[in-house]
Amino acid sequence: MESWLFLALILVVALLGKNMSLIIATAVVMLFKLLPFTGKWLPTIQAKGINWGVTIISVAILIPIATGQIGFKDLIRTFKTPAGWIAILAGIAVAVLSRYGVNQLAAVPQVTVALVLGTIIGVVAFKGVAAGPVIASGMTYLVVTLFNLHF
């Protein structure tokens, strides 16, 4: 019963914040809880869901390469600008930090509660986005904007 109340509270907050991603995610999880056979699915989704999400985001990021919007000349140009190097370093930093984050979640599962709360606050109150790889882009945006750099 407590999990239903917790999910309902998250849904209300998402609705008040008009955050469609969180609304859909919460509704899907609540739907899963209603279905009798999903007891076996939930641990699998919990264990592999982040990787699935990263894969979907990676596919979306690679689409401009597939459509020809981004080519080798763009890659080479990246190495010629400070903003490009910042983007590369931000990507490396996020990948390395994520490795430590995954290890911490495995060692200290209680961190998940704080992360969920922080993510909900960030998404709803500050119009943030609950996505991992996009963090590198956000870090890049911050530094590029602070130093008025361009690609």
UniProtKB/Swiss-Prot annotation:
Protein name from the UniProt record: UPF0756 membrane protein LBA0919
UniProt xrefs under InterPro entries: UPF0756_TM
Record key words, sorted: Cell membrane, Membrane, Transmembrane, Transmembrane helix
GO terms under cellular component: plasma membrane
Family annotation (Pfam families): DUF441
Subcellular location: Cell membrane
Family from the record: Belongs to the UPF0756 family.
Annotated HAMAP family: UPF0756
Transmembrane region(s): 4-24, 52-72, 78-98, 115-135
Protein topology in the membrane: Multi-pass membrane protein
